[in-house]
Amino acid sequence: MTWLKHGCHVQDVSIPVPTTRNHVPGRHVKRANSLMLFTFTFFLPVVALSFFVFVPLVGAARISSSSSTNLVHPLENRLGSSSSNAPLTSLPGFDLRSLGASKIFAGTLTVNEGNGRALFYTFVTADVDDYTTAPVTMWLNGGPGCSSVGGGFMSEMGPFYPDANAPLGTKLVKNEYAWNRVSNMLYLEQPAGVGFSYTNTTSDLKVGDERSADDVRTFLLRFFEQQHPELAKNAFFIAGESYGGHYVPSIATAIVNGNAKYPHDLHINLQGIAVGNAWVVPQLDNYGAAYFWVTHAIISKPTFDKINETCNFFDVGPLLRDEGECDNAVDAAMNEMGNINIYEIYAPVCVNHQAAKRVSALANAAAPDSPFMRAVARKLNRQHTETTRAARRDAGQRNQPGYDPCIDDGVAAYLNRPDVQAALHANRTGLPYPWSDCSSIVEYSRKDLLTSRLPEYQNLVANGIRVLVYSGDVDAIVPVTGTRLWVAQMGLREVAEWQSWVEPETEQVGGYVVSYEKDFTFATVRNSGHMAPYVQPLRSLHMFETFLSNGKLTAN
């Protein structure tokens, strides 16, 4: 057993644990006011919309303590649901007939009439003979404050991706390994203020895990009762990534408690949750990130030692700068790391107008717009795409469009088209700001951000909820090293030891897996980062399908 200060124990793992001076009960660390948690979408603009790096905030959801914004929905007396019980009949730049039996629904459902809170969603039926026999899975990207429509639906496991070889935002290409092959898929933009979801009440933009979870439970009740009653009794799963490590168990807990407390409400048939590269226990996830950097040779051992000695892992992270020596250690890490793709360390970066000006993966992403650099970037990224397409083909993704490190540019351009918004029943009342992948107006609770959600996972397991925790093994932000630490703290008995698992179509090792009592599984997805379903779609689909069927990932 290894002792972590502040009373945390880490058992049965060989990863060293923090020894920082800041792990002293009651120590207060003064922080620079200008530094906030930064979600990665604006750091290296590629596919995921939900990750953490601890650098100056640029355009993502803020950690609440500042004054409220006035950017709320301005049309209070036009509140109402804009969803339709009819599937989409057309979608610009894409032939819906290519989806086979699958249909897409989209719209907005009100979750609080008094304040005017309404959440936007897309829903993709399973590509099976009878979708009413398939489970329903809700996917949530993290942030906090990032879009599951821009993330999951448009750039990870959804039915299509932006076409990197077409003019920006004009065409989509089919995802052959979309998760709706095996499940009905619901993608929800939450909390209000994210994406096309809105509120008429400024104070709603200050939000945390509890209200987010309550709003999502209300949304689900109305979704199943009003929009898809034919699916109300189906097995229901929740999946997510990054800050989804908070969202998912909080929502699952609200559902379990609601089912027990309100027997006359619709019973949501929650069966399990899955979280990828999940932010769960801040001090362990923070330490795990720094440890990953040094063990993957992107920073030096002396720099790691200095971060470990001088930076506070119990705050928002080793890279939210402290005064003095911690600040110097952060500078050293930035210089050593260079401008790599920090959430997929062996993948190319997006060489756009901002990234071209940066020299470090941890540097401020703010930069003036440069059409020339963007044009250069499009050419360079096509070259990167050809290289990574070959790598994905070798891994079994034969018909996939290839990894595009600038996919979020295409997503934003596409979702801001008026004809696309009309097709999706989105933005019908005219939001006073464009759609963006991560909200700049939501002010998320710092207290919740720094709260461990481990007790919720333990309680869900005790209530018979199946849990899959998975890690893309080359993510350097919420990496496997931190996840292994908090999984060990679950206190569960191991029932099947660590072993490889094989993706059967390609007969290649898809990752590694260990199983615990009470249907708790921890798996890795080999050669993928923070957005495993995009980078390794076939392996991720096999893992997801195995989880839904309550099967086992095996080497056979």
Predicted regions and their residues:
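Short hydrophobic alpha-helical segments enriched in small aliphatic residues
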Residues: G7-V13, V24, V29
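Terminal and linker regions of secretory-pathway proteins
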Residues: W3, G7, K30-N556
